[in-house]
Amino acid sequence: AFELPALPYAKDALEPHISA
């Protein structure tokens, strides 16, 4: 699992389908 910070860019990069 990836331990990335809770940033808006990270969420969009990890789950772009959510924004689609």
UniProtKB/Swiss-Prot annotation:
InterPro entries given for it?
Mn/Fe_SOD_N, Mn/Fe_SOD_N_sf
Q: Span of the secretion signal?
A: none
Give the EC class as a word: oxidoreductase
Q: Which UniProt keywords apply?
A: Iron, Metal-binding, Oxidoreductase, Periplasm
* Chief site of localization: periplasm
EC number(s) reported in the record: 1.15.1.1
Its biological purpose is as follows: Destroys superoxide anion radicals which are normally produced within the cells and which are toxic to biological systems.
Q: How does it assemble?
A: Homodimer.
Q: Into which family does the record put it?
A: Belongs to the iron/manganese superoxide dismutase family.
In Swiss-Prot or TrEMBL terms, this protein is called: Superoxide dismutase [Fe]
